[in-house]
Amino acid sequence: MIEKIWSGESPLWRLLLPLSWLYGLVSGAIRLCYKLKLKRAWRAPVPVVVVGNLTAGGNGKTPVVVWLVEQLQQRGIRVGVVSRGYGSKAESYPLLLSADTTTAQAGDEPVLIYQRTDAPVAVSPVRSDAVKAILAQHPDVQIIVTDDGLQHYRLARDVEIVVIDGVRRFGNGWWLPAGPMRERAGRLKSVDAVIVNGGVPRSGEIPMHLLPGQAVNLRTGTRCDVAQLEHVVAMAGIGHPPRFFATLKMCGVQPEKCVPLADHQSLNHADVSALVSAGQTLVMTEKDAVKCRAFAEENWWYLPVDAQLSGDEPAKLLTQLTSLASGN
């Protein structure tokens, strides 16, 4: 229902317009206060790169963060990552992730990023506190990448990167809750790079698609072509589950059942195992896998995806960030 409201297919969005105007008024006032320096943003002693969204829902932001961190690491840059840790319930904040940190403590995306990149990752509702925690323990970090936080103006930033869904784009264009917008589309004029996940990119936008890898068994780590798996049940607890189901079909998999879950939904063995009958194989997203690995069964697999950016602009962006991190 919410997708139909945000896309404009359902007329119910009009009923939510008063709340959207209120949201837009408040968010605009907050941004104006920082722009006029009525409120002071905290500036880190190292450059900060924000990777964020203008819309709610899954846009492919986390794969972009992983891509960015890995690309900078390959260039010899020491990177730290901060996140709000949506859905996390740590005993105290900021929380610096370790190999023992759970998704319940830190949230799904921070654990995934930590496991994929081995970069220092910290979570806190106050992102500046997370930055301070990383720099206190890892003073050699040269640049901070913040996963989400475009609207978190309390943290000053040097580079802003926005990721948008090239198919859904901005829906009906309205602020939450009548539409999907956290900020209006005009905000794109002030950011440094716009990355478009799928669809047809417009002038100045960097094309991106998600490239699936081999399926990975949660219990054994065994890898295989996902098309070799039989009697597949697909599970996705991400911002936009249909994208994952479409990816599986693109890989030659025709799931016997597709199970969309809420983004950041907590998972347990009983609930997940109930999705699969005898002889079936469960295939989930990597984001779900970080929550299920501790209690996984032998017929549970996940399909990792990597961000693939096209054109000349990604190299220019990486050159800019490398120079920034190096102090040049």
From Swiss-Prot:
Keywords: ATP-binding, Kinase, Lipid A biosynthesis, Lipid biosynthesis, Lipid metabolism, Nucleotide-binding, Transferase. Pathway: Glycolipid biosynthesis; lipid IV(A) biosynthesis; lipid IV(A) from (3R)-3-hydroxytetradecanoyl-[acyl-carrier-protein] and UDP-N-acetyl-alpha-D-glucosamine: step 6/6. Transmembrane segments: none annotated. ATP binds at T55, A56, G57, G58, N59, G60, K61, T62. Coiled coil: none annotated. Its EC number is 2.7.1.130. InterPro entries: LpxK (IPR003758), P-loop_NTPase (IPR027417). GO terms for cellular component: plasma membrane. GO terms for molecular function: ATP binding; tetraacyldisaccharide 4'-kinase activity. It catalyses: a lipid A disaccharide + ATP = a lipid IVA + ADP + H(+). GO terms for biological process: lipid A biosynthetic process; lipopolysaccharide core region biosynthetic process. NCBIfam families: lpxK. Transfers the gamma-phosphate of ATP to the 4'-position of a tetraacyldisaccharide 1-phosphate intermediate (termed DS-1-P) to form tetraacyldisaccharide 1,4'-bis-phosphate (lipid IVA). Belongs to the LpxK family. This is Tetraacyldisaccharide 4'-kinase. It comes from Shigella boydii serotype 18 (strain CDC 3083-94 / BS512). The lineage of its organism: Bacteria, Pseudomonadati, Pseudomonadota, Gammaproteobacteria, Enterobacterales.
